[in-house]
Amino acid sequence: MTSDAVPTTREPFDPTDVSWTPVSRRLIGARLTVAAFFLVPLLLAALAGAILAGEAWVWAFPAAVVLLGLWIGWLVPRQVGAMGYAERADDLLVRSGIMFRSMVVVPYGRMQYVDVNAGPLARKFGIATVQLHTAAPATGAAISGLPPHEAARLRDRMASRGEARLAGL
């Protein structure tokens, strides 16, 4: 292998010394429900338009909506599967993305506060979001799709680690 060979590792987004915790698979159902909330009325409108128009080419619109729904149904499980977090000694890592990967490193000492959110749909699916707030908005992070007990545990752990790191300043 030459020095200009393309590396096969995902090192910047998947450090080898880290044990990732995945988010709950229930996030898939929540995201697909939101997609269906928008796609079903759009499909009904496209079908009504195609029926009323009486032109064969207009059926391309309902077909496009169906294809979009199938693509979302294929994509969402993969997106959720790529999401995770890892707690290290001095920071929290949060990763997401398939094509456009992202990994945010949040130092415990930079955290100002941590909160847990769960809207009606999230509660129905038994998931919550942990939001980490820092002084710089770019270093904050959110972890969606956590079971409520794990979200509360992570919130308390991050808050206590943040206080311990700030006390050392």
Model-derived segments and their meaning:
Residues 1-169:
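N-terminal basic, Ser/Thr-rich segments that initiate or prime the first beta/alpha elements at protein or domain
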